[in-house]
Amino acid sequence: VAIDFEVIGDSEEGADRVNVLLAASRLETVDNVVSSIELGGLNAKIVDIEAFVIENTIELISGDFPVGISKDAIAVADIGYSATNFSVMENMKMIYSREETFGGLQLTEEIQRKYGLTLEEAELAKINGGLPADYEQEILEPFKGNLASQIGRALQFFYASSQISSVDILVLAGGCSSISGVAELIESRLGVKTIIANPFANMALAPKVNAESLAKHAPAMMIACGLALRGSH
């Protein structure tokens, strides 16, 4: 088991006590991350926890929340390839995190099944387009509805385990959050203001950076951006 800790302040339970944040993970999980980085020719100095990385990024983008939206309770759904990380922040501090085994892979597999493609071909078709005319109605719309249901279920799990009965805003991140209309559908289904994350919205870009391409992929860069912000505040 990989374990780390940090003293985060005095405890209300007494002058001789402090609050300590303890993080633990299976060593195998950490080793897999490190091995992936090394395959890319890099060396890992720090392995962070996704929930805390997201916390860094939410602090960055919270200034862009719609006017009048409270920041007391913020939900985040980071929709990855094979899993969705659902987390909730209270007063800008992470208080809840849960992983759901649902993500973009489910959409890719449906494309593969429907059109007789390999998984790689289906993934490329999902990204680049060119699928048959019935794709949106037969595959994409049901996937969007299923995604909304998964996030709604995750939200109900949180409410059942917390004294908080509602969140003020839901932030969508990850590649699937860029699917046209998904934020609007989720907001309509759940009755919670829903936005798509763009951690680069207020950053100055170097001339060589393709601003359009960066904006397109920005929601999928939440984790990378949060890692880059580590230690900056």
Per-segment meaning from a language model:
Residues L27-N56, S62, K93-A133:
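Glycine-rich phosphate-binding loop plus the immediately following alpha-helix
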Residues V1-S62, I169, P199-L205, A220-I223:
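Active-site neighborhood for divalent-cation/phosphate handling
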Residues V53-N56, S177, I195-H233:
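Glycine-rich phosphate-binding/hydrolytic loop that grips phosphoryl groups
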Residues F143, S165-I195, P199-A201:
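Glycine-rich phosphate-binding loops at beta-strand->alpha-helix junctions
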Residues E109, R113-K114, A122-I169, C176, ...:
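Adenine-nucleotide phosphate-binding core of ATP-dependent small-molecule kinases
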Residues D16, D64-Y96, G103-Q106, I111-K114:
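Gly/Thr-rich phosphate-binding beta-strand-loop-beta motif of the actin/hexokinase/Hsp70
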Residues V30-N32, D72, V76-E90, A215-H233:
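Extended, charge-rich low-complexity interaction segments
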